[in-house]
């Protein structure tokens, strides 16, 4: 008994160490990601009568400074933009403070909570003590590698509130249904189930739909097995009510009109279209479905492919008849696949919208792993050991490269902000554009800030809503971004390429010191690091 207890204690310590290490790295990464894009417009009270804060036409800006401002802003937002009242309220709540550190701390905690909820969904057991070290590695590594559009869904303040934080509400609502399937609970408070259903349904469109699908599947199974309890129906009713509040918001129609008439979000031609967006004339044409399949569906499926390995091994090792676990894994797989599939019929397909897919696929992968009898590392063949070491090495390089890219871009954006503050009395302010270090960006892929999300403080159009909001945020004149800057990162000679390798490492070292010990004399350090540019 003592030996068994010691073994369990050792596993618990190892799992806790994995989660804490992952949390520390993710907190560091959170600190590196600056405010950008929608973070500036959402810092102000939403004024729907002037086309809102994200479209051309707004000229007056008043910061959200208290809960009264927030309530006024969200009422206007709900009537004139979209129905994501819970997510956008959280966005504006954390933007009341200028310092992003409060969000960074909370966001890291929410990310770890999301992994714990995924574990409970997959195994039907709550708590760290029920997670083995191998499962902890799958949860942390699998989430980092497979979460779609990681920066936009889990680190960008506005995006994280809409996807990571709303994923908490969705998976928390589904959890009692999962526990019921595993026979862990029978009774559950109806009022709590109804409330969690409303919160889940009123979150985001794809996530709410996925939660409704999974909870509905378990409710139907319970009815067929004569295991139904009234709280399950109350939860579904709450989910449906929440989705109605989300989808029938008066602002949804207004937003579509504004984006078509007064904004540059929707492109005018296919050549101008950004990933996930298409001109109105091409909606529901062959070109739209081809674009969505290539840029959205397949990217999500391929990104999540590593999580299918435990599932494939699970079914390959099976020799007996179909079990309850088989059905549960297939149900999670179906919900995961439904998310990118449904998005094929959406008028917009930003990859971040498929975030809920990774929640349920990771739960399925964890459930499969918990039933596998895998050999220890010492029992593996030399070829398998090499494969494991190679996979770990690639993962470490990917994580480190993403931190280096984010550090370098963070310093570039800090310089933009310092320049704006130092010259805010001028009528026009010109800032250098930001550039991505090519070598580390290649190694990091989309696990770091990349061309799909990077924009610095603003864009190259001084009249763009983002530029106007950033100028109002810092109390400056019009801001222009010099997109024609001949940056050394874009040059092909040997010296420039060497600089593109060494300079980001210096940025990483300085940013690490700044986060750990404080900013210090940042301007002096930045002048030194950029004097060769």
Model-identified regions with their sequence ranges:
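Membrane-interface micro-motifs in multi-pass membrane enzymes
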Residues: 132, 137-181, 204, 301-303, ...
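Short hydrophobic alpha-helices at membrane interfaces in multi-pass membrane enzymes
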Residues: 179-199, 228-234, 383
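Intrinsically disordered, polar/acidic, low-complexity terminal segments
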Residues: 11-86, 91-118, 126-134, 385-533
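Short, Lys/Arg-rich, polar N-terminal cytosolic tail immediately upstream
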Residues: 1-6
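Transmembrane alpha-helical segments
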Residues: 114-122, 169-181, 212-220, 310-312, ...
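Signature aromatic-anchored transmembrane alpha helix within multi-pass, membrane-resident enzymes
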Residues: 190-193, 240, 329, 372-399
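Membrane-interfacial loop-to-transmembrane alpha-helix junctions, especially the N-terminal start
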Residues: 12, 128-138, 189, 228-235, ...
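Transmembrane catalytic cores of multi-pass membrane glycosyltransferases
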Residues: 27-103, 157, 198-336, 344-353
């Amino acid at each position: 008994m003592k030996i068994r207890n010691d073994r369990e204690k050792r596993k618990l310590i190892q799992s806790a160490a994995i989660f804490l290490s992952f949390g520390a790295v993710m907190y560091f990464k959170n600190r590196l990601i600056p405010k950008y894009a929608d973070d500036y417009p959402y810092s102000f009270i939403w004024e729907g009568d002037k086309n809102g804060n994200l479209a051309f036409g707004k000229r007056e800006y008043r910061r959200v400074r208290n809960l009264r401002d927030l309530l006024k802003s969200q009422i206007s937002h709900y009537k004139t933009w979209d129905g994501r009242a819970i997510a956008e309220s959280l966005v504006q709540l954390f933007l009341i403070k200028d310092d992003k550190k409060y969000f960074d701390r909370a966001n890291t905690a929410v990310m770890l909570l999301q992994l714990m909820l995924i574990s409970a969904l997959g195994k039907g057991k709550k708590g760290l003590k029920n997670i083995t070290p191998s499962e902890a590695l799958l949860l942390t590594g699998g989430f980092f590698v497979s979460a779609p559009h990681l920066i936009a869904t889990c680190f960008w303040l506005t995006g994280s509130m809409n996807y990571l934080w709303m994923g908490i509400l969705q998976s928390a609502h589904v959890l009692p249904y999962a526990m019921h399937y595993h026979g862990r609970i029978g009774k559950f408070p109806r009022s709590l189930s109804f409330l969690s259903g409303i919160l889940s349904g009123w979150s985001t469109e794809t996530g709410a739909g996925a939660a409704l699908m999974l909870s509905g599947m378990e409710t139907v199974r319970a009815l067929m097995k004569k295991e139904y309890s009234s709280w399950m129906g109350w939860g579904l009713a709450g989910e449906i009510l929440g989705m109605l509040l989300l989808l029938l918001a008066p602002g949804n129609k207004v937003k579509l009109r504004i984006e078509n008439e007064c904004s540059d979000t929707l492109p005018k031609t296919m050549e101008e279209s950004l990933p996930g967006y298409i001109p109105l004339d091409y909606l529901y044409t062959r070109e739209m479905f081809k674009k969505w399949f290539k840029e959205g569906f397949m990217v999500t499926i391929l990104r999540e492919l590593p999580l299918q390995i435990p599932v494939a091994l699970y079914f390959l090792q099976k020799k007996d008849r179909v079990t309850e676990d088989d059905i549960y894994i297939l149900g999670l797989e179906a919900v995961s696949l439904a998310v990118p599939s449904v998005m094929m019929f959406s008028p917009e397909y930003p990859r971040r919208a498929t975030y809920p897919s990774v929640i349920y696929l990771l739960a399925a992968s964890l459930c499969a792993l918990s039933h596998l009898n895998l050999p220890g590392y010492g029992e593996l063949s030399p070829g398998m050991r090499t494969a494991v070491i190679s996979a770990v090495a690639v993962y470490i390089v990917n994580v480190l490269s993403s931190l280096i890219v984010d550090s370098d871009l963070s310093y570039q954006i800090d310089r933009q902000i310092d320049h704006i503050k130092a010259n805010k009395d001028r009528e026009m302010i010109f800032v250098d554009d930001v550039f991505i270090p090519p070598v580390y960006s290649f190694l990091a892929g989309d696990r770091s800030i990349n061309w799909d999300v990077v924009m610095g403080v603003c864009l190259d159009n001084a009249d763009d809503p983002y530029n106007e909001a950033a100028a109002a945020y810092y109390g400056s004149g019009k801001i222009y971004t010099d997109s024609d800057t001949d940056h050394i990162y874009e040059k092909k000679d040997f010296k420039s390429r060497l600089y593109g390798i060494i300079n980001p490492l210096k940025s990483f070292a300085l940013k690490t010191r700044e986060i750990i010990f404080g900013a210090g004399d940042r301007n002096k350090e930045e002048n030194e690091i950029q004097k060769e540019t």
